[in-house]
Amino acid sequence: MTADEDRIVDLLRRLDPEPVRPVRVDLTAAVHEARRRRRSRRTMSVSAAGLAVLAAVSVPLVVGGGPSAGPASQPASPSTSGSAPATIAPPATTAPGGPTACTAQPLPVPGGHAKSLVTGGDPTGRFLAGRSYPGDGRGNPVILWDGDRAREYRLPGSDQRMVDVNAAGVAVGSVYLDDRPQPYVIRNGRPARLPGLASGEATAVSADGRIVGARQIGDRQRPVLWSDPDTAAVELPLPGPRWEGTAIGVDSAGTVVGKIHDGPSGVTRTAVWRAGGGGPELLPTPSVEGGPASEFVAHSLRGGWITGVAFRDEGKVRRIYPARYHLATGRYEPLPSGVSPSAGNGRGWVVGPVDRMDAGLLTDAGTLRLPDLDGRTGRYAAVAVSVSDDAAVIGGQLDVEPGQKSLVMRAIRWSCR
């Protein structure tokens, strides 16, 4: 692989799941043009031309952070306007915990298709959501795994994906139909379009069936909430008329977390909507090594923990500081350098790429690299996208033919102990 190819593949690891672009890390905070393309769904299929364009608009990314990233601890005070950066607190003192070993197992794929992905998982580890790539021109069959049992769903349109699932097996996501994204739910074994949106997507579902996502209006998005799968979506209030964005997490207490920005060129802010209504609280950005972060982009909400990445711009270099935010205490905590969280669990543990080579699990005990099918680590294109609250089950994918010119991604469950 050439240096240019390596750079492109590394960039694609940070985009939404496809067989040739394994992991989803939101580049909207780094490249607003990439946000515009994703919203218009022009990145839903990758071509050689698309790779060149994406590489051209990218900026240098340098991973920073780690336990020494922040000064002395200080709680973060949410606000609805600009605020001083919040200092990242040292990691909480807790007893060491978490798995010390994992094994990888391919998930069964109906039809035996060579390429498949995991796109989400539930907090208990029982359910995983994903999709396969039959290449028959009918889009991507959605798969729900209940343990080792796999069920395939043929949804209308193309680019079908379920991105989250709860402990009851309710899965949410979207399809691309009639030249626009449309939100979908699978409940009790039956797929259905979510009501109230002409165009949009569902991004997360709570234990009690609340669903969040975004309404699509041209190139803009506005965060929405479905109180249940049968009730029409309602837009969540924003700080002003130019603001836009999407909700990315919801819990059974009614707390919603989202990523919003003031106009197409505004910096990304993490927003929190509490139960009972009212405008969003805008979390301050953390202080990181070298000064205040430019942005903090949330990726997931689970058990009161928001996991994501902070960015600090230093000239033409954008530095990345993985971090998590605890809603109950109002504190940021740094995550070790080299870990880029793609999902978190109810204990604040995260999974994601490690040092551009492996997928990893970060717990209070440290970082555990996830093995390949033969128990090794260090081969490119291992991707983790979901982690159960006890970290016993991690969903993701592996390149099962490493060293070849093209990636052959296969849906994987890591069982950890």
Regions found by a protein language model. Give the residues of each.
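Residue-level hotspots at or immediately adjacent to binding/recognition sites across diverse folds
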Residues: 15, 40-43, 58-417
